[in-house]
Amino acid sequence: MRLDDLDVALLTALHDRPRAGDLELSRVTGVARGTVTARLRRMEDAGVVTGHGPEVDVGAAGFGVQAFVTLEIAQGALDDVHRDLAAIPGVLEAHATTGSGDVLCRVAAGSHEELQQTLLAIDRSSCVRRSTSVIALSCLVPWRTLPLLHSSVAERARRPR
């Protein structure tokens, strides 16, 4: 789905005011409430907007030790390792990747000892052939999407029609 200026304006307003309703968003963006409702529904249906729940800072919630784990897995074992990783609470996300590893995981724990237990649980998967981990010392750029969305709209505006 290609996002236009209004879509990005709505996403920016939602980012700045996560609890805003359609009426407030219509005031902020200067468009009719029905337009806001229709645009948000369209973005939800397309999978652009995936939820309205709170963003949780795992560090502030007591899980300040975070690491990235690269896994090399058995040939054809992606579905099995997906199942195994999904069962481990400390695995925040896992991505199939290209390069030297097959899967990249982000994990969190409350202490180094808990991190070790999470890493051991990952290694217990029969699909994992090798794992390497690095501990994150700090987050330099937190998860974000708005700069990418704004640059996309700006790039399209610069193109000749």
Language model feature labels by segment:
Residues M1-R161:
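A compositional/biophysical signature of low hydrophobicity enriched in polar/charged and small residues
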